[in-house]
């Protein structure tokens, strides 16, 4: 399907807008996937709140020049599907890692995180990044640990006195 100049400009603006809102991106070669497998992948992407779309590589390159994903330009060859994580850096990587376990034909070409191009081998590492809620709970646990330890330390002398008094009471009762 041929696109006119206005449609191409709109597509570049759309890609730029999506890329500017994204926290990470993944480019993958979808050669060999059936229509039903692509539909399943799209459905999973919607559920994971990951933007997934096939764009023309030339339009994606043009759009990426204005974003932090310019590093992805070198992997935009052949049939490429782009995944953009809007909220969590590891969301797209988790989605793809799970999909690859079932359908080995999806081949990751590269990941972009923080304006850096990461090789496909880093997919598992990025997928293991904690979600926002997990990261916040880990941070809360780290911040609360010293306070909890202090409270236990302050309560220990009182608890010792209580144990001694209980032992004396039990000894007198016997």
Curated annotation (Swiss-Prot):
It comes from the Bacteria. GO terms for biological process: translation. Keywords: Ribonucleoprotein, Ribosomal protein, RNA-binding, rRNA-binding. It holds the Pfam family Ribosomal_L10. GO terms for cellular component: cytosolic large ribosomal subunit. Disulfide bonds: none annotated. GO terms for molecular function: large ribosomal subunit rRNA binding; structural constituent of ribosome. Transmembrane segments: none annotated. InterPro entries: Ribosomal_uL10 (IPR001790), Ribosomal_uL10-like_sf (IPR043141), Ribosomal_uL10_bac (IPR022973), Ribosomal_uL10_bac_type (IPR047865), Ribosomal_uL10_CS_bac (IPR002363). PANTHER family: 39S RIBOSOMAL PROTEIN L10, MITOCHONDRIAL. Forms part of the ribosomal stalk, playing a central role in the interaction of the ribosome with GTP-bound translation factors. Belongs to the universal ribosomal protein uL10 family. Part of the ribosomal stalk of the 50S ribosomal subunit. The N-terminus interacts with L11 and the large rRNA to form the base of the stalk. The C-terminus forms an elongated spine to which L12 dimers bind in a sequential fashion forming a multimeric L10(L12)X complex. HAMAP family: Ribosomal_uL10 (MF_00362). This is Large ribosomal subunit protein uL10. It comes from Coxiella burnetii (strain RSA 493 / Nine Mile phase I). The lineage of its organism: Bacteria, Pseudomonadati, Pseudomonadota, Gammaproteobacteria, Legionellales.
């Amino acid at each position: 399907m041929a696109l006119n100049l206005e449609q191409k400009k709109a597509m570049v603006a759309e890609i730029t807008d999506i890329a500017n809102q994204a926290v990470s991106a993944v480019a993958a070669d979808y050669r060999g996937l059936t229509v039903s497998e692509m539909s399943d992948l799209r459905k999973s992407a919607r559920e994971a709140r990951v933007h997934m779309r096939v764009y023309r590589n030339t339009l994606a390159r043009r759009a990426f020049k204005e974003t932090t994903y310019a590093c992805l330009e070198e992997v935009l060859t052949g049939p490429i599907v782009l995944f953009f994580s809007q909220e969590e850096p590891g969301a797209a990587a988790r989605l793809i890692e799970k999909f690859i376990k079932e359908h080995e034909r999806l081949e990751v070409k590269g990941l972009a995180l923080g304006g850096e191009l990461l090789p496909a081998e880093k997919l598992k590492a990025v997928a293991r990044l904690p979600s926002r809620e997990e990261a916040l709970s880990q941070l809360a646990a780290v911040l609360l640990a010293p306070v909890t330890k202090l409270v236990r330390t302050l309560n220990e002398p009182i608890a010792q006195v209580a144990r001694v008094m209980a032992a004396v009471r039990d000894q007198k009762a016997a």
